[in-house]
Amino acid sequence: MDLGPGDAAGGGPLAPRPRRRRSLRRLFSRFLLALGSRSRPGDSPPRPQPGHCDGDGEGGFACAPGPVPAAPGSPGEERPPGPQPQLQLPAGDGARPPGAQGLKNHGNTCFMNAVVQCLSNTDLLAEFLALGRYRAAPGRAEVTEQLAALVRALWTREYTPQLSAEFKNAVSKYGSQFQGNSQHDALEFLLWLLDRVHEDLEGSSRGPVSEKLPPEATKTSENCLSPSAQLPLGQSFVQSHFQAQYRSSLTCPHCLKQSNTFDPFLCVSLPIPLRQTRFLSVTLVFPSKSQRFLRVGLAVPILSTVAALRKMVAEEGGVPADEVILVELYPSGFQRSFFDEEDLNTIAEGDNVYAFQVPPSPSQGTLSAHPLGLSASPRLAAREGQRFSLSLHSESKVLILFCNLVGSGQQASRFGPPFLIREDRAVSWAQLQQSILSKVRHLMKSEAPVQNLGSLFSIRVVGLSVACSYLSPKDSRPLCHWAVDRVLHLRRPGGPPHVKLAVEWDSSVKERLFGSLQEERAQDADSVWQQQQAHQQHSCTLDECFQFYTKEEQLAQDDAWKCPHCQVLQQGMVKLSLWTLPDILIIHLKRFCQVGERRNKLSTLVKFPLSGLNMAPHVAQRSTSPEAGLGPWPSWKQPDCLPTSYPLDFLYDLYAVCNHHGNLQGGHYTAYCRNSLDGQWYSYDDSTVEPLREDEVNTRGAYILFYQKRNSIPPWSASSSMRGSTSSSLSDHWLLRLGSHAGSTRGSLLSWSSAPCPSLPQVPDSPIFTNSLCNQEKGGLEPRRLVRGVKGRSISMKAPTTSRAKQGPFKTMPLRWSFGSKEKPPGASVELVEYLESRRRPRSTSQSIVSLLTGTAGEDEKSASPRSNVALPANSEDGGRAIERGPAGVPCPSAQPNHCLAPGNSDGPNTARKLKENAGQDIKLPRKFDLPLTVMPSVEHEKPARPEGQKAMNWKESFQMGSKSSPPSPYMGFSGNSKDSRRGTSELDRPLQGTLTLLRSVFRKKENRRNERAEVSPQVPPVSLVSGGLSPAMDGQAPGSPPALRIPEGLARGLGSRLERDVWSAPSSLRLPRKASRAPRGSALGMSQRTVPGEQASYGTFQRVKYHTLSLGRKKTLPESSF
């Protein structure tokens, strides 16, 4: 692996010649940048991608075809100082961000589209594939390459249906079960796809390391390493981020010895707790005419048969169970009858089930059965058997269920209620017709004639073919038809035998006799509403599913286990738990269950959290000490300065859901995914993409859940710098690297971000903890609460970014990369504190630093006062104005644009001569402390100047009366002992304050000798530093700038002894030209400061205070003697 820029001078074996050339070119390029020149794009060769292999494999993944060069600003890439070019991103359509792109359905491929959308919104996998970070031999990872091309096209908005078709062909080529256009399970395809990606990348990740790296190369930052270098030897990307381990423990109830078994998993399949009963409604048909129909609600057992339902209905009606007939009745007529041995799950919740009570049978004589006995001849016995069968048909009764239909066949529709009659099978057609009319007589019109009308309707036997199931009016005994015999012969145990008949009326006859008679209306009992409410509110939580999944169970007697310690068969206790947790946790809800011989889909609502899923209760307890952790976790997964008991490694956030709509026989798959750019949820239904509210994510169709662990961002990711960062999510997104490739013609993301976005959803609270461990390591600095922001969690859980046009002028600046390191401590700030505490003199400082107090650093700063403080923006509660005071409590009028008065020293003419010679020269600091300063442009010329006389009068009166007001300045100054100013100073100014502290120490030590010389010659009168004689820059002030104010000689002498020490303990007023507009790399809070035209600021004053070092983000009081 190539050495980083910082390791070019390290020892170790010599690199090959191509590497040496590249190192020399990079060194030369850095030298040009250090001189302030900017090389052309063609002068410097593109830096290879981290982990790029130059020949033999180094372990991890194999070389990908056509490696993608590292994007500017990526970890390990040197970034030149100065303004950075605006990064380009694929432009959205104005309404949806990149990544919110649908997929074409190529014929029952909804299962494939839903899984691809969920994986595309998996940030770690999407960045890994889209940026080509995998190392696969060409032609040996076709599925992975096609998936990477498809994911890349979704995020660059270059998707075409041809890409998804090629991906489907690749899947069909290597997975024969997915050939054709059949429906498939989304979970089956997901596991197959992850396994295929693992196989494509596994072979190349087991190669030996070709060369031994020098020790200096092993000390480089983790951000410079590729994903393959971060993975353990022999592990693929899927194993590292998707795979974890189960632990199955078997405990002997006698000796309490435990046997553990560990198994890997890619997905956790959670069973859904089932209710023991379910809701079912049944309509009872009573023989009385006052109340014929009553609909009741029942809680029937799930694992039961129709016999249990028949028993429950008999209890509701108060009749014996063997006198209840259960049938299914729809608007088209009778459908089927239910028998006792049938599974109760064959009756759905919405089926119309009718229960008929058998009418009491009239007293009738016993059938005279002629005993066969022994006969003289077989012929006589046969004739007697035929006579007995004829008497059975002619004299037996049969139960008839009939309903009235208008029309014929399958197009008929029912009117009126169903009826149950008992009729003799030997009756004629006319007798059967009169019996039916007597039952429906009360439904007819009063004036309708029913006598001598001939055949009014046709009768069809239900349950057989329509063509051969009609009874003939010409038959003398129509109930003796073969169709009736067949129905009675096919009956099974459960209720009395019966025949279902459909009485089909002609529409004209029906209108003449019944008018507009419709179906019956059944009255609902109170039990219907009660049972519906009890069963419709059934839901469970995801934690309950985990508890049900990991609960301890005892082995059955047939599955007894022989304990190796007791050597006896024992019914051990089995418990399944999670031993390790993956970065990407995939949870499968088992909605398809096997009940008997039938598989059903469970529509139970499983309530799962969108953020903050705590997996700590479901992880196996370690028997080791708490410091041992959870196993061999990589170092980048462990947060810095966290207590060992803080469960940050157990928190997960949801980012995708795969839904199933329909039943087991057929359905449709959709996906709900959260976009990592705007934080909004979107619904993906093949090619249709629509925004989704957060309260609509949790549905009864949720099938597969995708969770990502918080802070599980590897150092090779573009988002690795977002830990502890407060910049926007756009500046840290990996898509910036993809959009910054050479030759990219895609538009900027700002065109999409300027579109109006919906309101910000509620982001889960960030964990707040005390960094006590850091305080102990840093020398006992004052403890300060550290709040991990939104960047601390997964990038897909960031809050949606609002419109750029509505965020003010500060948000319209070009996007910048965050240089905050994930694991590297702020080295520059620590070195600065150590340097100040050591009281050492800076190197390479051969000239006097006092000249900078009276001169300016450039031509654009002539209007600045020699003793004015460096401009610092402050945001205070009272509108951004801070009260300033002069030296030793001398006030500065708030209405004055002049600078505060600074007493002079008594160095005499020699000092004045040196100040003139050294005016305008920059201070030379050691390279170690060459920190950038924030240069704020002066806007004094934009302010209308007031009359000079009025200025001098106000200042003189204020100085004599000791007013507490301070002169306003174009920039806000830093006040050491002002509470408002201290509260108003933002964290962005801390690197600058650290630089001022350094300059104060250098300035103080440099001028100590001059104070001694001044004490030897007290006859030299003190000279004001603001007098024009000492500062040649003051003579050439810009027009419109206020004149320098002079102090009377007596007043200066009176204040000299009292204010002499205050001058040297005050902050330096240097204004050095900065080389870069960015903060130090080591500081996590260092950010470039921008000034909006029209913003007011002021120059600070000198005060006697105890200054603090804020470069580390913490306040530490330093004694004045150190300055």
From Swiss-Prot:
Residues 29-39, 1016-1027 have a biased composition (Low complexity). Residues 101-710 form the USP domain. Disulfide bonds: none annotated. Signal peptide: none annotated. The active site is at C110, H668. GO terms for cellular component: nucleoplasm. Keywords: Hydrolase, Methylation, Phosphoprotein, Protease, Thiol protease, Ubl conjugation pathway. Residues 17-28 have a biased composition (Basic residues). The modification Asymmetric dimethylarginine is found at R746. Residues 1-102, 202-221, 795-826, 854-886, 959-1049, 1068-1099 are annotated as: Disordered. It catalyses: Thiol-dependent hydrolysis of ester, thioester, amide, peptide and isopeptide bonds formed by the C-terminal Gly of ubiquitin (a 76-residue protein attached to proteins as an intracellular targeting signal). It is an enzyme of class 3 (hydrolase). GO terms for biological process: protein deubiquitination; proteolysis; translesion synthesis. GO terms for molecular function: cysteine-type deubiquitinase activity; ISG15-specific peptidase activity. It holds the Pfam family UCH. Coiled coil: none annotated. May recognize and hydrolyze the peptide bond at the C-terminal Gly of ubiquitin. Involved in the processing of poly-ubiquitin precursors as well as that of ubiquitinated proteins. This is Ubiquitin carboxyl-terminal hydrolase 43. It comes from Homo sapiens. The gene is USP43.
